[in-house]
Regions:
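Hydrophobic/aromatic-rich structural module bridging two neighboring secondary-structure elements via a short loop
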Residues: 1-28
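Ferredoxin-type iron-sulfur electron-transfer modules in oxidoreductases and energy-metabolism complexes
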Residues: 22-30, 34-80, 85-248
Length: 248
């Protein structure tokens, strides 16, 4: 019925529409081979790109590597992924950009980015911050809706974003946008829509700023530019207070 579901988790009687019909289609964002069979090769290629294996900090010990319960909880949810492809099928970004790694691959990446035994965290988040990576996610949450397990890919993507910022991997539009967004809310309790686009591309990224010019001019002539001076908002200090409490 237009969404990816696991047949083993659904009762047919709950899926029939008003005409007592269930629509079956191949998984989305994958090339059909025959009937409902699709080619999973691009899916696995994306998973392999994130290096879904441990790259340890040190030589293998004589016994197993130890992890505390707290350390394991960071990767527990991602470990529940069964690679069913449901999130990949319904991803809106993959529908328009085949270079996007996709929610399944990025959820698998978080499994190793935050693994306390892995020694390549910085290298991983640098690779994942490139075009097609974490910052190309549109935050629609469709992957979470489709995921049949606690993996919740979008939550895993957000965790990689947090690690990337903590590691200082901020020289990209996505990270700059997130930092500008947070700075604006922290300082004024609202979004400064005039400065955020500029800070997102970078003050000294002249090509990026030039690319913004046509959009800015169209907005200006259509009267769509945000005002320079905003009207005051009642209790805006509460927004700043909430932000500060969450930021602690």
């Amino acid at each position: 019925n237009g969404h990816a579901l696991l047949a083993c988790q659904r009762q047919a009687e709950h899926l029939v529409d008003d005409n007592d019909t269930i629509t079956l289609e191949p998984l989305g964002n994958m090339k059909p081979i025959k009937d409902l069979v699709v080619d999973f090769t691009p899916f696995w290629d994306k998973v392999n790109k994130v290096k879904p294996y441990l790259e340890p900090k040190e030589a293998p010990p004589e016994k197993e590597r130890h992890q505390s319960p707290k350390e394991f909880l960071l990767i527990d949810d991602a470990s529940t992924c069964i690679m069913c492809g449901a999130c990949h099928s319904d991803c809106d970004v993959l529908e328009v950009d085949e270079n996007f790694l996709g929610p399944a691959a990025l959820a698998k990446a978080q499994r190793f980015v935050q693994d306390s035994r892995d020694g390549k965290t910085l290298e991983r988040v640098k690779d994942l911050s490139k075009p097609g990576g974490i910052w190309d996610c549109t935050h629609c949450g469709e992957c979470v809706e489709r995921c049949p397990k606690p993996a919740r890919p979008f939550d895993r993507i957000k965790e990689i974003m947090t690690v990337a910022l903590e590691q200082g991997v901020t020289n990209n539009n996505g990270a700059r946008h997130a930092l500008s967004f947070a700075k604006s809310v922290k300082s004024s309790g609202r979004l400064n829509e005039n400065i955020i686009p500029v800070e997102s591309v970078g003050f000294f990224n002249f090509k990026g700023l030039f690319d913004l010019l046509p959009v800015g001019l169209r907005m200006f002539f259509k009267g769509k530019n945000p005002p320079i001076l905003h009207k005051s908002i009642d209790e805006v200090e509460d927004v700043k207070r909430i932000y500060m409490e969450l930021d602690e």
